[in-house]
């Protein structure tokens, strides 16, 4: 499961509850860490127990078993220091606050979608009145009328 943006799920469900075998939680989109400016976004990768033997290992603490891919990076600790930002964000909000943040993400996305819908085509909502935490605008008309290109 792509957990790059968990804004519509945090506090309400989880990748495990949805029966995902693997989920990468990219922290910059959901838990307030900066993206870029020192490296790519990062975050934990959660797996179900049956996949643990296939996980990569750390070069200084573990020896690869026969099914592991071994070490996949030369960065000893990755961007571990950035995890303190997400930890503080979650700790300060608490369980109720994290859930409320999810509700606001969904509310804000739907508010903006409704405000922009008269002016832009919205992709992937055919027959639906609401979106989850995001929506995709078709900017083809704007690009043609202004000459702005990618």
Report each predicted region and the residues it spans:
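Conserved PLP-enzyme active-site core in the AAT-like
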Residues: 1-67, 144-148
